[in-house]
Amino acid sequence: MRPVFPLILSAVLFLSCFFGARQTEASASKRAIDANQIVNRMSLDEKLGQMLMPDFRNWQKEGESSPQALTKMNDEVASLVKKYQFGGIILFAENVKTTKQTVQLTDDYQKASPKIPLMLSIDQEGGIVTRLGEGTNFPGNMALGAARSRINAYQTGSIIGKELSALGINTDFSPVVDINNNPDNPVIGVRSFSSNRELTSRLGLYTMKGLQRQDIASALKHFPGHGDTDVDSHYGLPLVSHGQERLREVELYPFQKAIDAGADMVMTAHVQFPAFDDTTYKSKLDGSDILVPATLSKKVMTGLLRQEMGFNGVIVTDALNMKAIADHFGQEEAVVMAVKAGVDIALMPASVTSLKEEQKFARVIQALKEAVKNGDIPEQQINNSVERIISLKIKRGMYPARNSDSTKEKIAKAKKIVGSKQHLKAEKKLAEKAVTVLKNEQHTLPFKPKKGSRILIVAPYEEQTASIEQTIHDLIKRKKIKPVSLSKMNFASQVFKTEHEKQVKEADYIITGSYVVKNDPVVNDGVIDDTISDSSKWATVFPRAVMKAALQHNKPFVLMSLRNPYDAANFEEAKALIAVYGFKGYANGRYLQPNIPAGVMAIFGQAKPKGTLPVDIPSVTKPGNTLYPLGYGLNIKTGRPL
C-alpha cells in the first residue's frame, strides 16, 4: 500500500499554491493606486495608445537594405514607443533568441515607456507554439490532455510563467481553451487540450492559474472557439455553423469556467458565428457579402462575452494582420470596428517595419479619434477599456514596476531560471508520461537491440530524424542500450523507391515518424490507396510503404504519430503504434521539444508511458466509426487498457 501522508501533503501544497494566487492579487490591489484616477489624467491620444499592441518583429533602420530581426532596442523603435505611448508590445521568436538578449530588450522597452509600463506579451503556449530561444518548451496542451493531471497543468503554467517573468515578459497569450472536436482543424490540433469540454476546462483553468501564480497576465483563446473549424484564420475566414445551444454547451464552456475563476484576458477569434451574429459586410477583397467575424462583432464581444458571460477583464483581438481580417477589412476600419464591438486592445493594428511606415500608426489613432468625435465610439467606452488595461497592469505588478534590479542583476537571475535543469527535468517527465501506446501486438515493444543491430530512422524532416538519432546516442552513452548502427531516411515530398525498400530490408529495427496536419488519405472501396501518385499525399503514402515493406520482410516496426494523433488511423496494419503529440526535433545542439525523445525512450523501454487519448480517432476506412476512442491507451508491458 502506498503511504498516504506524502500524497496528502503534496495535495495540500498544490492547493495552497492554487488559492494563494488570489490572496496575492487581493493584497496587491489594496496597495495599488487607483486606475480610474490615472485614466482621468490621460489625454485621448494617450488612452488610445494604451489600446494598441503592435509588434516590432523585424525592423529596417535608416541606411539598411531590408528589415532585420529586432533583437536589440534602437533609437527609432524607442521613439515610436514614446511617441504613441502604446499599452503593450507583442514579442516573437525573432525578438527573444537568448536569455541575456531578451532581458536587455525587455528592459529597454520599459525604459522607452516611462509613464505607464508596457504589457510585454508573447505566445508561449508550450508545445508547437513557443517563442523563447532558450526556454523550457514543454510537450504542449494535447500532451497535457493525454497525461490528464491538474498538477501537471498547473506546474506547466507556473514554470512557463516563472521563465517569462524572469525575462521581463509579463503577458502570455495562453492557454488555448479551444475544444478540438474537428479532426480536420488545420490550426488548433495539438494546441488544444482535448475534444472533451470537461478535460479542456479543467486543464485550461489550472494552466491559467499556474501563469497567474507568477503574476503573468494570462489570455484565454480563441473566443468563442476555434476548435471546430476546417480553415486556418491566418489564411482564410472560418465559419462555425452550430446553433446557440450547442455552442453554449461545448465551445463556450471552458471560457465560462475560466472566467468564473478569475481570467485576466480573453483573446478573440477571427471566426464567423452566425448563431450569434448574422450581420453581413461587403468584403474589400471581392465585394461579396460576408458574415462579420467574432472579433468585429458587438453582439459577440459585448452582448455575449461581457453581458451574458460576465467577463470584466481585458479583451484583446487576435492579430489583425491575419488574412481573415486583413483580406476583407481595411486596416484602420478593422481597428475601429473591433473597438466598437467592445474590444480593449487591438493586437498588431498596423505592420510597421521602418520609420517610413510610421504614418500607419498615426492613421489608426486618427481613425479612432474621429470615431470618438462623431459618436460612433463613446469616449466613456474608451475610458472603461483603458481602466481595465491599467487595472490589469496594477493587478499583475506591472504598474508601478516592482523589480528595481539593474539589468545586469536581472540577466544573472534569468540565467538561473530560464531553461534550468529543474525545469527541463519536469518537462521530460511530463512528456514521457503523456506518450500514448495505441498498439503493441506480439510484444513488439520495447525494442531490445543487440550490439551492432541496425536501426533505421524514418521521418519527414531532418530535425525529426536528428531528434530520434540523438536520443538513441544518449541512451547508448548512458549504457541503457547496447551500441547500435543507425541510418536515416527523410521522406518529405519523396516517393518510396527500390533503394528505400533496400534500407528497410537491411535494418533490424525500424522507427518511423508520421507527421500530418490534416489527415486525408485516399480511400477506395474501404481501403487506403497506396498506389496514388499525387505528390501531395507523400505524408501518408511514404510511411505506409515503409510499414508494408517492414511487414513483408518481418522487421520490427513502430509508427510514432508526431502531431495530431488522427494519422494513427492510417496504420491499422502496424503491430506497434504510439502517439507523442509534438513534432519539433533537434537542431543547433538542443531538443526543440521533448515529445520525440519521450517516444524513443518508451520504444526502448526506458520510460513508462501512461497517456490516454484526449480525442477520438476516427476510422479513415469506415466513415462514421471511431477506431480509437477518447480515453484509450495501453499498458506497454501487458498490452491491456490503462
UniProtKB/Swiss-Prot annotation:
Cell compartment(s), UniProt: Cell membrane; Secreted, Cell wall
Source organism, top-level taxon: Bacteria
Pfam families per the UniProt record, alphabetical: Glyco_hydro_3 (PF00933), Glyco_hydro_3_C (PF01915)
Gene: nagZ
Annotated PROSITE patterns: GLYCOSYL_HYDROL_F3, PROKAR_LIPOPROTEIN
Site positions per UniProt: Important for catalytic activity: 232
Biological source species: Bacillus subtilis (strain 168)
Protein name, per record: Beta-hexosaminidase
Membrane topology field: Lipid-anchor
GO cellular component, one term: plasma membrane
Covalent lipidation (S-diacylglycerol cysteine), chain numbering: 17
GO molecular function, one term: beta-N-acetylglucosaminidase activity
